[in-house]
Every structure is written in C-alpha cells, then in structure tokens.
From Swiss-Prot:
Protein name: Large ribosomal subunit protein bL33
Single Gene Ontology MF annotation: structural constituent of ribosome
Gene Ontology cellular component list: cytoplasm; ribonucleoprotein complex; ribosome
Upper taxonomic lineage: Bacteria, Bacillati, Bacillota, Clostridia, Eubacteriales
Short name of one Pfam family: Ribosomal_L33
GO biological process, one term: translation
Matching InterPro entries: Ribosomal_bL33, Ribosomal_bL33_CS, Ribosomal_bL33_sf, Ribosomal_zn-bd
Gene: rpmG
Key word Transferase present: no
Stated family: Belongs to the bacterial ribosomal protein bL33 family.
Superkingdom field: Bacteria
Native species: Heliobacterium modesticaldum (strain ATCC 51547 / Ice1)
Keywords on record: Ribonucleoprotein, Ribosomal protein
C-alpha cells in the first residue's frame, strides 16, 4: 500500500517535497538528503504527517 508523505527540511522546517512510499517496505519515517531552496544547500529532509 503506497501512501503520500511530505518531506520537511530539518534546518528551516519547511515542507519542500511531496512523495509517496510503500508502508510495507518502509514502516519507519524516511529521511532523504534533498535540496532546500530556502537554505540554498542540500539538507536532510524527514517525513512529516
């Protein structure tokens, strides 16, 4: 079952990306290194509600 999730920057707390994940394969919250246009650098983005 795939679910839509938002990814928020850990530096500025802005929600920059929407993605989906498979809850069966990734039951925990995902963390990805993505570009934040407000921080102007690559930062870790964590899954939010």
């Amino acid at each position: 079952m795939r679910v839509g999730v938002a990814l928020a920057c850990t530096e500025c707390k802005r929600r920059n990306y929407m993605t989906n994940k498979n809850k069966k394969n990734d039951p925990d919250r995902i963390e990805l290194k993505k570009y934040c246009k407000w921080c102007k650098t690559q930062t870790v983005h964590k899954e939010t509600k």
